[in-house]
């Protein structure tokens, strides 16, 4: 162990071994470089385990008090930078135990009674991820709130809607942003749902078969905030479903972030120009002084590959493992740690982008929705209201659009006389129906982009976020 109060020494193996590990294999085998991330959880689990051993009469109360005191001292040493595990510790569990024995002597050797590193690491990892879920929930809520704030600002703003990245129908911009609010809500629900399966304690399952030591697994589960225990000891130490399930849920978060990121990149392009990037969230070019680059959404879009890759890696790692514990499981931690870190960073970055990094160019948006044929469907709807069968109306409007393209005019620029040459049912009120605002307002079906419907949804979301005094 290098330079810390924990000292050095060989691994904690039995006398079955006559030789030490080859130095290269020792480096290859060790996980202390990354699983030290689990230190706080390892200490919490060990404290609960020590108290349970005393409650069950396995060790003396005084010994449990000594163990708890020693574990808290390790926590303090870690906070002050004095606790510095090294390669010889192999992992966080041995590092803590070695220091505890150095502090307490023979009493420190009693801590591992009735447990194995197999159930210990499973406990640590679940405790760690549970805490990260709480933090991710706040990131998701913050991102939702940033989307909602923008939606409240633009409840009366229009934006072109697209299918196949071709202009389709005009939308209320708030409606577009609320679509992402809904996506994030599903993300939050998925995280909450997986927590139910995550929050079971494997502690006390020991290596794989349980233990003859008279322990109380439910006591430690309760002390650590778990909802219950694994019913099968073999399953308890073999299960890494929660790492896959979380990474899959995080991958969907990244999908949603990436879809918005792609739209922001498109909206910020000179060809589109729907948003203006601020200096707070954009970068320049080392060669071209006129450039303002959308690095934040581009990085978010790119970082999806990391999260997706970790998900695939976890699936591949687990798929061929026989029960119970296998060293392959060591590979779950760096993947899981990076999924959490990357997803959290991307949520934070996109939240800041929405809050400080962009503004919508409403004049450009208004001009865009007025300069295309995205109101063509409304001509068909108009004719349907005049008792023209929809498919007939659809074919007719296609012919009208073709004519307009050939003549270089918009639908609203045709004269009433020319319209009536296409169909006699058309009257002067068609022109009012074709204005972009009326096109949007007409979408009054529940969940539609009509202003009244959008305001209903804004009111619901504002109430959820305590913003019920918003005026649209």
Curated annotation (Swiss-Prot):
It is found in: Cytoplasm. Its main location: cytoplasm. CDD domains: Argininosuccinate_lyase. InterPro entries: Arg_succ_lyase_C, Argininosuccinate_lyase, Fumarase/histidase_N, Fumarate_lyase_CS, Fumarate_lyase_fam, Fumarate_lyase_N, L-Aspartase-like. It is an enzyme of class 4 (lyase). Keywords: Amino-acid biosynthesis, Arginine biosynthesis, Cytoplasm, Lyase. GO terms for molecular function: argininosuccinate lyase activity. One of its GO terms (cellular component) is cytosol. GO terms for biological process: arginine biosynthetic process via ornithine; L-arginine biosynthetic process. Pathway: Amino-acid biosynthesis; L-arginine biosynthesis; L-arginine from L-ornithine and carbamoyl phosphate: step 3/3. The keyword Isomerase does not apply. It comes from the Bacteria. Its EC number is 4.3.2.1. Pfam families: ASL_C2, Lyase_1. Belongs to the lyase 1 family. Argininosuccinate lyase subfamily. NCBIfam families: argH. This is Argininosuccinate lyase.
